[in-house]
């Protein structure tokens, strides 16, 4: 099964305490593509959550606005192959989670796991000393899993994958 989303807008998640309303949730399918779309106004859930084996996430604007309280802006909980290129991800000051992008957070990963993030802009407006632009759960992914981060622009405090602070710009 494949899902393709082009030039769509998702926003203003319901504000029900105790429930997780993801703006876009993709189950465990073969392929997911989202391109040229806008996601904002999350509440406790993630802006994009995909369990697909293959993900193409290109040229999207996934920025939680001032009233937003989203958790992750992008969650790929089961790993898989993900090409994340040319997006803008932005975390609101009232975020529910210190990471913008999460990879492999849950168990039962895909056998082939590769995250390539290039030419993205990541903005952290949360004033947390725990902020992470990209968080990878290596202990939950296959041993051969790869993560390639290249030419990403960051604004605000944060680090990548538990490493030393990337700094504040």
Each language-model region and where it sits:
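Glycine- and acidic/polar-rich repeat regions and solenoidal domains
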Residues: 1-169
